[in-house]
Amino acid sequence: EDGHWVEISPMSIKREYDFDQVGHKDMYLLHHEEIESLALNIPEARRIRFFMTFGQSYLDHMRCLENVGMLSTSPVDFEGRQIVPIKFLKALLPDPASLGPRTKGKTNIGCIFTGKKAGQDKTYYIYNVCDHQECYREVGSQAISYTTGVPAMCGALMLLTGKWNKPGVYTVEEFDPDPFLEALDQHGLPRSESRTPVLVD
């Protein structure tokens, strides 16, 4: 915010938002890696935030596991061996790929922008709604994997077709977004847009 990193306690800022086709969900302010490159590449941005939704049951389970030490990354002695609790927990949990057939509902992933264009205040919301079961029917995975894989494929397509072509290492926001967004539209992640979204305080 205003050119400075702001640190807060984990999960301490919660907002409720009414997501198109998904409904009212609690979302939490947290760090995500794209914030870092956006802050570097768009220094005139006054504030960049990332919110993600979590259900109360998920949070309760995470707190319980944290309270008993199962989320620790520090090795502990167990029956004469050193184990890392969170790695042990991972070994007990189901393979995420096995959850595809049982995952139901939809994702809503988007960005809300506010700013000025030609001296006029503007607000713009671009988002995608993706159905878990439709994704599973198409590719055998749920929408979380789908909404991760399709943009990566579209980015590769931009490089292979020469639409994105600069020597060096760059992040997505450093290229022309239009052909990338068009590729997303064509390959299963069509966008929706709103000029009057509800803003998040």
Residue ranges of model-derived segments:
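C-terminal catalytic/substrate-binding lobe primarily of soluble NAD(P)-dependent oxidoreductases
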Residues: 1-201
